[in-house]
A protein has these predicted regions:
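Active-site-proximal beta-strand elements of phosphoester/diester hydrolases
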Residues: 2-10, 99-111, 143
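Structured beta-strand-rich core segments of catalytic domains in phosphoester-bond hydrolases
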Residues: 38, 43-110
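N-terminal, active-site-proximal structural segment of metallo-dependent hydrolase catalytic domains
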Residues: 1-48, 58-64
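Active-site beta-strand termini and strand-to-loop segments that position acidic
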Residues: 71, 95-98, 222-223, 248-252
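Surface-exposed cleft-lining segments at the edges of enzyme active sites
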Residues: 82-83, 108-124, 159-163
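Metal-dependent phosphoesterases centered on the DNase I-like endonuclease/exonuclease/phosphatase
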Residues: 52, 126-212, 216
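Conserved beta strand-loop-helix elements of the APE1-like EEP
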Residues: 61-76, 205-227
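Active-site beta-strand/loop signature of hydrolases that rely on acidic residues for catalysis
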Residues: 8, 24-42, 102, 131-152, ...
């Protein structure tokens, strides 16, 4: 049985000032994946006994970035998608394990005014193709901030956000294509109807206090892993970022 955690920390140095180290230790995951680390190599001395860490930094300072802490030695580590257009922002790390691939991702935000929506569409297609290729050789676990609320149940105010970044028809359709390509949204696998549970809240308008949030952080799993999934959780009680950690437990 392995426990995996994914958390968009919205700046790891800031999160460390808000109790990250204690939270990490308490959660005691086999794999702990981070998005939006917002740092460069050497800016933070962070290590945990029993874990090896892998980092993918954005070239732009204080932006994006991903990391994985693992108790288990991977066979191979890959950074990025192998596509130059996508590989300057530190958005993807892949660990090849004996029985599966683990991919963590910080999906590009389409931004205000949907300035980056066209790029996002290209990203979604290329990322889906990347996962499908991995899935041909081993099952895949995918986690991270996918920057999309899949259905109306996945955000507090679907009607007012209909054409906003993260809830456009185009982004939602691309997410559905990813599921159709052979992946399971693990939280919905266990809790298909659960409402009012989110993983991100704006810092504005007392959104977290009012639970006016979005579920945009996911663990996806290859459909072949369905019978091995044991539990999925969203840790809404954990603060330290505008996102909260999400979790999956797998018998693998």
């Amino acid at each position: 049985m392995i426990k995996l955690i994914s958390w968009n920390v919205n700046g790891l140095r800031a999160c460390c000032d808000k109790g990250f180290r204690d939270i990490f230790t308490q959660l005691d995951a086999d794999f702990f994946c981070l998005q939006e680390t917002k740092m460069q190599e050497g800016q933070l001395d962070l290590s945990f006994e029993g874990y090896t860490s892998y980092w993918n930094y954005a070239e732009k300072k204080g932006y994006s970035g991903t990391a994985i802490f693992t108790k288990h030695q991977p066979l191979q580590v890959t950074y990025g998608l192998g596509i130059d257009e996508h590989d300057h922002e530190g958005r993807v790390i892949t660990l090849e394990m004996e029985k599966f691939f683990l991919v963590t991702v910080y999906t590009p935000n389409s931004q205000d005014g949907l300035k980056r929506l066209d790029y996002r569409m290209t990203w979604d297609d290329d990322f889906r193709a990347y996962l499908q290729k991995l899935n041909q050789s081993k099952p895949v676990l995918v986690c991270g901030d996918l920057n999309v609320a899949h259905k109306e149940i996945d955000l507090k105010n679907p009607k007012t956000n209909r054409m906003n970044a993260g809830f456009t028809d185009q982004e939602r359709e691309k997410f559905q294509l990813l599921l159709d390509a052979g992946f399971i949204d693990t939280f919905r696998y266990f809790y298909p109807e659960q409402t009012n549970i989110y993983s991100w809240w704006s810092y504005r308008f007392k959104a977290r206090e009012k639970n006016a949030g979005w579920r945009i952080d996911y663990f996806l799993a290859s459909a072949s892993l369905a019978d091995k999934l044991k539990e999925a959780k969203i840790h809404t009680e954990i603060c330290g970022s505008d996102h909260c950690p999400v979790e999956v437990t797998v018998e693998i």
